[in-house]
């Protein structure tokens, strides 16, 4: 199956890598790709299809937060995701958080869009921003979820330059 290449989404002080899931056969290449982008945490939002031990051996923490394909994330995963980002980007400025689902077109982009929205971006702008790099991202159910999502501005803190930053 031909999968889209990983894409980096950078906004203000946040860096994300959206990617598809590897197999045990492609795990070495996948791990090298993560290291190239400086990934320290990988969030897996689909069922496990590979052994995470080799990834963790390379110093990349793997979190398993699966939710249904095509569906919006449950509230608990949204809370966990935003809390993770708040901590990561404060403690490791410049780090990159990777997130993957099966194809990297639905669940993973939704979580990145939520982070952008929580930082003050309008949902339409967040969708367009991600789709510029990840064509085909989001299905209609996910778009409706993002449209109705009401941010609590959990990632919106201003630094002295007026930039969104995580504190």
Curated annotation (Swiss-Prot):
Catalytic reaction(s) noted: O-phospho-L-tyrosyl-[protein] + H2O = L-tyrosyl-[protein] + phosphate
Binding site for substrate: 107
Impact when changing residue 165 to S: No effect on interaction with RABGGTB
Cystine residue pairs: 46-101
One Pfam family it belongs to: Y_phosphatase
Residue ranges listed under propeptide: 165-167
Gene Ontology cellular component annotations, sorted alphabetically: cytoplasm; cytosol; early endosome; nucleus; plasma membrane
Tissue expression profile of the protein: Ubiquitously expressed, with highest levels in skeletal muscle, heart and thymus. Overexpressed in prostate tumor tissue.
EC annotation from Swiss-Prot or TrEMBL: 3.1.3.48
Ranges where the Tyrosine-protein phosphatase domain occurs: 5-158
Active-site residues (renumbered): 69, 101
Binding site for phosphate: 102-107
Modified how: Farnesylated. Farnesylation is required for membrane targeting and for interaction with RABGGTB. Unfarnesylated forms are redirected to the nucleus and cytosol.
Lipidation sites (S-farnesyl cysteine): 164
Role of this protein: Protein tyrosine phosphatase which stimulates progression from G1 into S phase during mitosis. Promotes tumors. Inhibits geranylgeranyl transferase type II activity by blocking the association between RABGGTA and RABGGTB.
Official protein name in the record: Protein tyrosine phosphatase type IVA 2
Originating organism: Homo sapiens
Encoding gene, per UniProt annotation: PTP4A2
